[in-house]
Amino acid sequence: MTRYMIQVRATAMSEAGEFPDDPTLVARMMAFHDEMAKAGVLLDGAGLQPSSQGFRVHYDAGGQARVLDGPFAETKELIAGYTLIDVPSRDDALAWARRFPAPFPGQPCCIEVRPLMGGVDLPPEDAERLIREELAAIKRRG
């Protein structure tokens, strides 16, 4: 099984914190996510607040962090929401993504689907241990 993230790209509407004026949209989204849950493929999913509520941490070549508060100008590069699924193949991920309800009816929108790195699911304690080991190795390398 491979985990995929279905990313709904932001629009001017989502960045303004507005929702489409479609009374059935929420019901369609909920029904679709419920169907994925019943099929055993849904791991998580949520909409995101506009980028005005977020921040970015930029690192220079020396590893110094600089925080930039939103909003961010390039709406087409932002994510408005995500759904995380666990499916046997790319074709299965594509099949689910194609059935995703149009998140912003009447507006063009893009959904991007990408596999997560690391195809093996680990228990949380093992995942945490591996992350700590990787961070320690990075620190040792400088």
Q: What is the predicted role of each segment?
A:
Residues M1-G142:
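Conserved, structured core segments of small domains
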